[in-house]
């Protein structure tokens, strides 16, 4: 299966929650989830099951991917000159130990967030950075997708040192697009969440919370 299909065939709705220094991307409510319409990735046997929950820090999205792949996405304009930092709080309850994530057969992640920049007339020409919660690699590692050089996998968290616990991470998306794609990006066009296990045929359980962009 082509990873470009995974990234760019997601269902997007347009929305924008913003303040001077922060842009919130997802609300993680039942109403929002119903609007996003989970769509199965072409070639996957099943859809990832997404559901809404809550804890003392607010709402979260739970994903269960059992030999499955589907994603949630939003078209949202992010001014990377004002708010270049993506902030993600997430947790992995069941990971994908033993897979080789930089190969086609092992290119699955219990949790990932795509930052997408439109760079052409068609979705297949877009560029993406795939911020991942790895099951096997160290934080700070990165590599081109085994399916396309237009997407780069960048490990922000790893179950090697953060398993079954909430962890918050941050990355400068503007600098990342320059580093990985040699692009000077002033505005981001979309963000997508996906938990997928269709290549490895395994099962993962993950949680997402508080995904937003900030000035610092």
What are these regions (language model features)?
Residues 2-10:
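Sec-dependent signal peptide recognition
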Residues 20-43:
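Extracellular carbohydrate-recognition regions
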Residues 48-71:
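Short carbohydrate-recognition loop motifs
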Residues 75-86, 160-163, 184:
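Extracellular/lumenal carbohydrate-interaction signature centered on repeated Trp-anchored short motifs
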